Curated annotation (Swiss-Prot):
It catalyses: octanoyl-[ACP] + L-lysyl-[protein] = N(6)-octanoyl-L-lysyl-[protein] + holo-[ACP] + H(+). In the reaction, the free carboxyl group of octanoic acid is attached via an amide linkage to the epsilon-amino group of a specific lysine residue of lipoyl domains of lipoate-dependent enzymes. Keywords: Acyltransferase, Cytoplasm, Transferase. The keyword Transferase applies. It is an enzyme of class 2 (transferase). The keyword Transmembrane does not apply. Belongs to the LipB family. GO terms for cellular component: cytoplasm. The gene is lipB. The record marks 139 as: Lowers pKa of active site Cys. This is Octanoyltransferase.
Amino acid sequence: MQHERMNRPLIIRTLGRTDYLATWQAMQAYTQSRDEHSHDELWLTEHAPIYTLGLNRKGVRLPSRHDIPLIEVDRGGKITYHGPGQVVIYVLLDLKRRGMSVRSLVSAMEDSMIALLAEHGVTAAARADAPGVYVEGAKIASLGLRLKHQRSYHGLALNIDMDLAPFLAIDPCGYQGLQVTQVRDLGIALTSEAAAQKLLDKLTTQLGYTDRLTENTL
């Protein structure tokens, strides 16, 4: 029975642009309803402009602009921005069933993005003091997770081809003056759609899945 559960296909949901609040609530509901037979899932999406404030709120500078909504959420970390042209992948895994630590999951997420950039000649790295992926000190991807009963939700956001100006109104991830960058500005000619598929392939491999199914709805 344990072998059967470990080899259930990974479900990849390609959702297009979604409402942040509705997607967050769907993640919570799925995680709450999970049992030992539930599939692990990756949700690929993109959001309309929104700031999200994680659970680590001490000393956070709130956005200096008010034309973009701000929502308080239950992931780790501080404040970040989501918007069109950014690849978002939510990671809904049963870590206990997979024998995976949170640190291993974070590393898999970071390593998949680092490998994607390396394919295009860009050297990127993670930082122990600030989860995410960086290119020459500028942040190109953010991470944030929540665990309930060793089941994860939330995930990663990789900047592809977006308006970076909203990041100027915050201290990304709580770091004053932290620069941000994106795939387009590094001279990589990848659409969000192409980058998303490449990243899904790499993340699936990093997580150790060999069988996956794709669906387009929640």
